[in-house]
Amino acid sequence: MHSLKDKRRVVKSILADIGRAHPVGIAEVDHQDLWQRATLGIAAVSASPGHVDRLLRAVTSDLDKRKDVELLGTTWSYLEAADR
């Protein structure tokens, strides 16, 4: 990949593949103007923290298996609903 056009093609493919395979929201959230890098944001909602954890691990595994990208790292954040 040597251009923004190539990068956008790969990112679009990733967004479509992950969106089809997993019930998550996914978008490119940073580095849109760099052809060498992309940052993806992935969101999942569930009543079970364990379910979200398994889901995010599955998404990460799918990304790591791709031959057209290199996964440099992951950062996970969790928000819990306040008790009423």
Positions of PLM-derived features:
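Solvent-exposed, flexible loop/coil residues
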Residues: 5-8, 30-33, 73-75, 80-83
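A generic structural signal for short beta-strands and their flanking turns/coil linkers
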Residues: 20-22, 36-40, 70-72
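C-terminal structural segments of small proteins and small subunits
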Residues: 45-84
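Short amphipathic alpha-helical surface micro-motifs
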Residues: 21-26, 55-59
